[in-house]
Amino acid sequence: MPQMAPINWLILFFIFSITLVIFNILNYFCFSYTPMKTSQSLNIKFNKLNWKW
C-alpha cells in the first residue's frame, strides 16, 4: 500500500468531518415531529381527594 502525504490525510479528515457535520445538521433540521394529542395518548384519571386533617 503506498504511503500518503500528511497533507492528504489532513484533507481527507476535513472532508470527512465536514460531511459528518452536514449530515448531522440535515438530520436534525429535517426531522418533523408530530406530537399526539394529550387527551388521546394519556388516559389518566385524577382522583381529587380532599384531606381533612
From Swiss-Prot:
GO biological process, one term: proton motive force-driven ATP synthesis
Full protein name: ATP synthase protein 8
Location in the cell: Mitochondrion membrane
Source taxon at top rank: Eukaryota
Gene giving rise to this polypeptide: mt:ATPase8
Keyword Ion transport found: yes
Family: Belongs to the ATPase protein 8 family.
Cellular component GO terms, alphabetical: mitochondrial membrane; proton-transporting ATP synthase complex
Function of the molecule: Mitochondrial membrane ATP synthase (F(1)F(0) ATP synthase or Complex V) produces ATP from ADP in the presence of a proton gradient across the membrane which is generated by electron transport complexes of the respiratory chain. F-type ATPases consist of two structural domains, F(1) - containing the extramembraneous catalytic core and F(0) - containing the membrane proton channel, linked together by a central stalk and a peripheral stalk. During catalysis, ATP synthesis in the catalytic domain of F(1) is coupled via a rotary mechanism of the central stalk subunits to proton translocation.
